[in-house]
């Protein structure tokens, strides 16, 4: 369909084209165009840069239209499937939905971990480019970079108050950063013999745990930087360490296909969980709010066969997610659906859902009670490596090998 311009619109377009040709040094083309379009020698100042402005405006509008179309498709799908619409959903039912609110760029290599600050409207990303970046997740603004590691930063973790940030790296070190004022590295701890793959604070904040490719887990005193305990038992690379909210136990997962749960105050392994058929990449402790959904999914009621927990989720290269009752060392349910390695897990604060990130480039939202994938987000152009769910605000963040960090709004 041919678009018809008014006489005034044609004159403005011709003036804008003439300005563009003149501004970019196309003198011969400008002379020919002026002659054919019957334009005066000098264009008015108001036409300066007009063509570029209109062009960028069209691109912005196209992007907005695509976002609105994605939201409309999403709403139509929910109506057809009979899912609760936004007005009918409670905050406990809000889940991440496309399109992403922000796609943040700046890292020069794969993203290895993304986490929210426990109090402020900030998030942190770690990357194989050896840097840590801080972002405002509500505005999408880049805040600053933390530099000090000399190799890939593998994991980051905040203490409960968000005053200290711990990081670990393939450079064999663990670093503590002041997150209140200076944003400087205040301690560097050495002791592992290989790549340090994961870090986590004990809830009281006085100790940090680290997991390594050297097959050990170490406990470090924050005040002194000294290693006070070394836990051994895994037969291969220890991929991740995560501490239970009460602080008395912590879990680790490994290339040896197992998950181990340890007593924090001793070096004893409380239980070893075996069922995965490949490397276990990630683990996440379930909040208390998830107990009801997990028990129902496991076929237990409050009178008979009720599982007390605590409950732990694990994701593996065998493409499955498993939910465990740690107190008895039993796998209660298995979630199937990903087409590649499962790399990240995070529970919905309301306890009804679990979100997962995978090398199949998707984020999946799992309805725990019904043991099914209720939503798939085609999140990134490459492997999804990490995910986090904010405990108080309706946001999810994800990181990828495509070097982007994405912020997803829950609704």
Curated annotation (Swiss-Prot):
Entry keyword set: Cell cycle, Cell division, Coiled coil, Cytoplasm, Cytoskeleton, Microtubule, Mitosis, Repeat, Transport, WD repeat
Spans of repeat WD = 106-147, 148-187, 191-230, 233-272, 275-334, 337-376, 379-411
**What broad class describes the main subcellular location of this protein?**
cytoplasm
Domain statement: Dimerization mediated by the LisH domain may be required to activate dynein.
Name of this chain's protein:
Lissencephaly-1 homolog
Coiled-coil intervals, chain numbering: 56-83
Q: Residues in domain LisH?
A: 9-41
Q: What is this protein's function per UniProt?
A: Positively regulates the activity of the minus-end directed microtubule motor protein dynein. May enhance dynein-mediated microtubule sliding by targeting dynein to the microtubule plus end. Required for several dynein- and microtubule-dependent processes.
User: Its GO biological process terms?
Assistant: border follicle cell migration; centrosome localization; centrosome separation; chorion-containing eggshell pattern formation; clathrin-dependent endocytosis involved in vitellogenesis; dendrite morphogenesis; establishment of mitotic spindle orientation; germarium-derived cystoblast division
Task: Cite the PANTHER family for this sequence.
Answer: WD REPEAT-CONTAINING PROTEIN POP1
**Pfam hit, one:** WD40
């Amino acid at each position: 369909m041919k678009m018809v311009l008014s006489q005034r619109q044609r004159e403005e377009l011709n003036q804008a084209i003439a300005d563009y040709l003149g501004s970019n040094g196309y003198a011969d083309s400008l002379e020919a165009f002026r002659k054919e379009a019957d334009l005066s020698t000098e264009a008015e100042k108001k036409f300066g840069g007009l063509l570029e402005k209109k062009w960028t405006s069209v691109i912005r509008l196209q992007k907005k239209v695509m976002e609105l179309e994605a939201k409309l498709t999403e709403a139509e799908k929910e109506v057809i499937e009979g899912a609760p619409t936004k007005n009918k959903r409670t905050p406990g039912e809000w889940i991440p939905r496309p399109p992403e609110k922000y796609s943040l760029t700046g890292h020069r290599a794969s993203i290895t971990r993304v986490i929210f600050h426990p109090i402020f409207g900030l998030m942190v990303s770690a990357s194989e480019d050896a840097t840590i970046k801080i972002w405002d997740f509500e505005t999408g603004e880049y805040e600053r970079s933390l530099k000090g590691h000399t190799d890939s930063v593998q994991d980051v973790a905040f203490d409960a108050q968000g005053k200290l940030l711990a990081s670990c790296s393939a450079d064999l070190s663990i670093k503590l950063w002041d997150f209140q004022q200076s944003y400087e590295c205040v301690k560097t701890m050495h002791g592992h013999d290989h790549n340090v793959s994961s870090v986590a604070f004990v809830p009281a904040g006085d100790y940090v745990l680290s997991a390594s490719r050297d097959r050990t887990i170490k406990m470090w005193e924050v005040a002194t930087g000294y290693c006070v305990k070394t836990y051994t038992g895994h037969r291969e690379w220890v991929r991740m360490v995560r501490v239970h909210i009460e602080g008395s136990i912590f879990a680790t997962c490994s290339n040896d296909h197992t998950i181990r749960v340890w007593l924090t105050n001793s070096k004893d392994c409380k239980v070893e969980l075996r069922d995965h058929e490949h490397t276990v990449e990630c683990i996440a402790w379930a909040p208390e709010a998830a107990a009801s959904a997990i028990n129902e999914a496991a076929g237990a009621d409050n009178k008979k066969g009720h599982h007390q927990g605590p409950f732990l989720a694990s994701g593996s290269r065998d493409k499955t997610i498993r939910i465990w009752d740690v107190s008895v060392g039993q796998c209660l349910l298995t979630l199937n659906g990903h087409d590649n390695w499962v790399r990240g897990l995070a529970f919905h604060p309301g306890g009804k859902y679990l979100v997962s990130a995978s090398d199949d480039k998707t984020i999946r939202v799992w309805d725990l009670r019904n043991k099914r994938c209720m939503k798939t987000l085609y999140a990134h152009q490459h492997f999804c490596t990490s995910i986090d769910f904010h405990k108080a605000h309706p946001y999810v963040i994800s990181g990828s090998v495509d070097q982007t960090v994405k912020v997803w709004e829950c609704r």
